[in-house]
Amino acid sequence: MQLQDEAYLPDVARAEWALHRCASAPDRLADPASLTLLTTLEPDALRLYLAPGCCIVRSDWPVVSILDAHLHGTPSLAEVGAQLRASTPQELVVWRSGLRPVFRQALPGEADLLSALLAGVSLGEALDAAPALDFGQWFPLSIQSQLVLGVHHEI
């Protein structure tokens, strides 16, 4: 077996590189008081502060499962093998929580939202780019996990 026969390896390398780069991303402090802007301004006038090193890795392969199996022991390697044979696509979200790089599988629509936010658009535009996202589910999770650190008003 040659490495070139393992089509998923470049995506796993991109995911591992994202985790590595995340570890040395510049620090940013959370600003929980800024969340009140969500109650007073329209989403088109707001931007979200994302955690250091935040990025998305989109893959035609089960990169999240591969990383989880190797780093956390679950799912089993047999389960990952089945996902590889089925070419199960996954989207990986990477960010730093405190000083620790973390990752998880993206929620439906989350990769579209984060890609738009990382491109510098307003929250309103990002929400338009992610119609599949349940923002009511995603936002509390993103605050609790320190993926979103605050909100600021676009000038």
Predicted segment positions?
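Long, charge-rich, low-complexity alpha-helical segments
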Residues: 1-40, 99, 104-155
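A general structural signal for short secondary-structure junctions and capping/turn motifs
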Residues: 11-12, 44-49, 83-85, 140
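Hydrophobic, aromatic-enriched interface-forming segments
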Residues: 26, 40, 46-58
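N-terminal start-of-chain detector that recognizes signal peptides
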Residues: 26-30, 46, 65-66, 86
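Short secondary-structure capping micro-motifs at structural edges
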Residues: 40-44, 78-81
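Low-complexity, glycine/alanine/valine/leucine- and proline-rich hydrophobic stretches
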Residues: 50-119
